[in-house]
Amino acid sequence: MSGMFEGNALPGIQTHSHTPNNYSPQELSLEIKAFISGVDQTQGRKLSVRDHARCAIRLLRTVPACREAVLEHLRGVYDEYVASFLQDLEAEGENGGNSASGGASVSISNLEDVIKEVHAVLSEFIKLSPKAWAPLVSSWAVDLLGQLSSKHAGRRAAPHSSSLNELLQLWMSCAATRSLMECYSQCLAAMLAWCPDACVDALLDTSVQHSPHFDWVVAHIGSAFPGTIISRVLACGLKDFYAHGYSSAEKISQQQAIDKSSRVPKIGSVVGILGHLASRHSDSIKKELLRMFQDSLSVPPQNVPQLTSGAGGWENSPHLRRATVPFLLQLAALSPTLLGAVSTELVEFLRPPVLIQLQAQFQALPREELENMLGLAVHLISQSPSGGARVLKFLADTATPSSVIISGPTPSPHDGIREACDRLLQMLLLHLHKLVHNRPDGDEPFPQSSTSPAMPQVIPFLEELQAHIADLCAETLRLERKRHLWLHQLLCLLSVYGGPSIATEALCQLFTQARNPEELALASQLYTQLSTSLSGLLPSTVARCVAQIHTQTLDIKELAQLLNNLATAVQSQEEDGKNGGGTTTTTGSLTQSSMASEVRVAVSSNLQDFCPLLLHGDSGVSKAAVRLLSCSQIPRACSPAHLLRICRAAVSHFFVCLRQQGKSPQAGQEEVGYSRRLLSRLAAYSSLSQKAVLQQLVEGALHKGNQDLFGGLQENPSDDTTQAQNLVPDLGISLLDVNRKFGTSVNFSGNVWSVFHAGIIGKGLKPPYTPLHPDPDRVSQNMQTLLAVMVQCCSSSGGNPTGSAGSTCSEPNVSDKLPPINAEAAKVIAVTLVENICPDVANGELSWPPEEHSKTTVERDIHIRRCFEKNPVLFYLLHVVAAGRPALCYCSVILRALLSTLLAHWESSREPSVSDSPWHLQTSCWLVSCMGEGQLLPPVLSNINEVFPHLSPFEVRLLLLGVWEYMRGNSPMPQKFTFCADQGLFFRDFSRDGDVARYIAPIHSVLHKNIDRLGHLCWRFQV
Amino acid sequence: MSDIRHALLRRDPLSAAKEVLYHLDISLGSALQSSAGPPAGLEKSTVELVEEFIFHVSKDRNIQSKRMSCVQELQLLEIICSYFQEQSKDAIRQVIFSALFSLQGNKADESRMAMLGKLVSMSIAVCRVPILECAAIWLQRTHSAWCVRLAQVLMEDYCTLVPCAISTLQNICSASPRFCCQLITAVTALYDFSTDELTPPPALLEMLVGWITEDPRLLLLTFINSPLNSSLPLGCLEITPLLGLLRWCVKAPLAYHRGRKSAMTNGHGDGEKGTAYEELYSKLHLSVLQVFLMLQVHLTEKNMFCRLTVLPVESVAALIEEVGRLCEKLAPLLDASHIQLALDRLAQALQVAMATGALLCAREDLRALCSRLPHNNLLQLVMSGPVVQPPPHSSPFQPNMYPHIHPGRPSPLSPHSPHQSTLSSPHSPHTVLTAHPTHPALAPHRPLTAHATHPALSPHAFHPASIAFPYRPIR
């Protein structure tokens, strides 16, 4: 049994024999003596640095009581290594001798082994017994790092403390300092579990003592333990902030000097540390700061045991909680980086319950401290690089009264909060006003830097708000109580601060977003306040609006709104102009008039940019555009290209309006009015624009897409085919298509027989085509509108604009009431009609050939007649041409075509009465009347249309044949007309044409034959 | 004295400290030689010099005291060690040690304790026996709170800071047994199992078991060397570490739940560690019981049997009350086996202590003390005690009974020792069997007869002889 017991004890003995602690007490005693004296006790020689360090390491392993002395001794070893390291770097930099470099290298190599051994021992100890070694080694390492950083900061090899990365690179390349850093990191990692405060406190104290040379240590440690360093640094800073006399004003006043000297370095160190970490760990810093703010307001946890480590200690201290908000404000004041990190999201935490708690906290503060805090908050808001827009929204939302009903004699907490935010907002505006106008005041709690007035200060709050102009304008235009006043004032400050570009943007946004005249008045007010300090605002604003339109950032509603607002701004001047003649205008009216005139000029300068909007797909936008353009004047220096583009857009819009008018008469009518006004202005601008407008109006009226507006018939597919064949040379129809269509049939285009397509052999006559008839009233209305526009355009002469054109509708047949039509304008219409109706230019001369000669142009004549059949508007247009004498001369080819086809019709007609051909009868009467109006026929001949309804077809033919003979004998030439200045018209003297008696002989014959029914008309035909 | 002080103020801290030591040596040595009797108290001026120039407590507000660096402090410690090593007269050493480190109740005591800790720690490393002997006396005379602090410093140095440094501490057992005895007492006062930090480190436990197993008399060293009629100062450490060690053995199973949680978290390894701890505590318990038996012999030799208090009843009562509170608190957390183990150990200790005269306590009082403890069979046996005899026979029975037991007690333990070791290794609950030899002397019950029915166990065959012998006078 005893042997078994001894066997059990034997392994322990063997285990002990293998441990390195096999020094005898005597040997340890000698080691201690050697360490103290630096002399080897057995050989009596002096220990080298390396041997002395190794002796220290042995004591560190074996004699616990020597640990502090050993660490103290090792400070010297590390210092010597660093000195050699830097000296070696400097020697290399200076290209020193090889021997010196070799010596330094040997020295560093020797000590490096020692340092590695020390590091290994300490690392092992920290790993095995963290609670025992970590506090000791961490304080030793941090203090030594601080000393080394400061001591060697002046060396040539050491970079300047401002270049943190270079400093970090240098020190981390040195084995000694890298070893210390790793030791400290290991200690900090170990101590996180139970008392991180002590570790971070040492770091902070060393940072205060050795900053800025020590910053690289903080940066490195912060990168390794960002969360812990951030939270502990903030907690330690808060405690220090409270300890340095924040608690009472009396204490502050008593120890002002001491507090200032001792307070700033600590919080400055906190700011420096967090500043270094912000480049990579801004999110962590933000979370910690916001969590700190939240915890300071939340109820402390109940029944939670007090942690001895103090990790969460500050949350349980009422005093520290109360000091948190001032501490955070102070931090933000000292560090723009921290201010930027927090201000972005801080407003999200400011919910009503949080605000109530804040108010409860601050009620206990003395008034002076509260005022200082408010001033500091205002300063911070103005200096916040980001999040300013959200802060502003929060303040405005909270400060806006929610209801006009008085809540009662006792104000509720919400009222207090609202009043506080109101006051804060007022202070902010005042502060910004001072900053913007660069008038620092003696009472300013935070005096500005001493920059010269020539260089404006940068205000981060306003810098950020410049990107939120649209939102600010939208909020301002809501016209809420007091809110829009604040925001309007802020817009003024922002515009003055930002310069013309910001002011332009603000005005542009107001013009874009205002929904009614009341809201639009804000733009006038803003312009009033800004025009004194900024010039050229409105041209820039309109240019900005144009740019906005080009980028298509606005939706349809916004685009229409913008155009309407601009039009309203322009119209206000005209109204004032009308009223200004007889009455005295007020100051506001004068200002508005001034703005209106400038807007008008600016819009005119950008007219070519607005005119494409006339053709916008949305009716609201196009209507607003035509309204704006109708109020504006065309610039004097408008280029022909721009002018033609505007004319084309305006004419296209006119036809769109006519179609819209059919759908909604009320709105369409208003829009048509704007369009007519615009076209009149364009026609009155110059002869070029007049010609362009008239030409495009004619072409538009004859366009297939618009024929139905004026009673035009829908085309028959068969007719279309025939027409297509006839128009091959003009339309460029593919011959291949034609050949495919008819197979082996040969196209006899131009052949006289191909025109008469009466039907299909074996199937009888072609069935008659029944077209869709549009609403007669609508057609009549559109016709009247078109004629009115054309008359207006023809009445205006280039270079002689009229103030306002009359909008009266005149009957086309009542020539006496028509205003005088410009001959050149009528000529434009005539030429355009000929170009659009006559398919070819052959035989287009003005003179009339013999009637038999018309056989050669029968196909063309029939085509022209069909055009008139499909487009009744042509009759009215010709009438306008006739009114503008001598323009009808240029329509000879059209007149001949119609007369020729009518002669053929009446000759071949077998009807007993002409009333059986109503279209032909009407056309015959109209044609003769028109030629009479155009003074191509003498009155005695033009009056024959009155007897046509009473004659037989043959008799009508005889009379029309007489007309042809007269035209052949008296060709219509413009030269035959004479201008009468008093009436503004051209007249033709028929007496110079010779005797007309021989041309009226057939008339008399017909009259004699029908004397019983036409006797009362004989006087109309007396020569 | 003023002249000396002014001269010292002009010197560097280390030189000044040396001069103070020299001054102490000269003055105190002379005083001892001149007076025939015990020396009088230290002069106040001497104490002030020591405090100002060795412990750097400034006496003048206007003068900032110079502090030594850590290396200089180490030099001073080395000088003190050398001085005590070279001083041949024990009386002078004691006086000077007392002059340096006797607590004065002022703010210098903190510096005193710091330097004392370093000095003793260093002396352990380099095995300075004179200092260790002086420290042992210091531990004997100083309030337990300060003793605990010194123990804490030493435990941190040798059990926590430096790995494997415990072997250095282990070696001083042969050099200074008195210091080790006092250190054990202080260490048991330091570690009370209240938290993880205040649980004895495994290395320390192993070392103590080794010390006591090697030389059980170590635990009685202070007791034996103390004057018989001397009364302990109020608040000082106990006269022996027996009660402290007993507290450890009883409380260890109740603290097992923390270790078990750790085992669950870390896996099987910690489970094995727990088993190793249990084995160590079992060995420690056995050693304590053996020391009680040795104590009986000593008391008998001094003719102080049942007259001298070794385990104060008040301390035992406090332990029992604490165990009761712990059992009640930890019942939901622990297995019943752990509680039973703790109570078994308590019962065994109480039985042996009362039998050997270490604990003077009537059974009626014991029953009252243990009334709130959970049920335990062995404890019930201990509390019930022997059968009450008729009055005419009680007086002649007792004197006859005890003399007969004493001569035969050591011999039965010898053959049982290996048996108990063997049984203790695999199954710690079987330590209950270690108490069986004591039953025949005090508790003749039928269960003993039941044990005789297990013929397979050869050690039990020995019991009939023992059983027959003590019962012969009764029958």
Swiss-Prot record, chain B:
Primary location: nucleus
Pfam families given in the database record: INTS15 (PF14964)
Region called Disordered, residue ranges: 402-444
DNA-binding in keyword set: no
Keywords: Chromosome, Nucleus
Family label: Belongs to the Integrator subunit 15 family.
Name assigned to this protein: Integrator complex subunit 15
Organism from which the protein derives: Danio rerio (Zebrafish)
Gene (name only): ints15
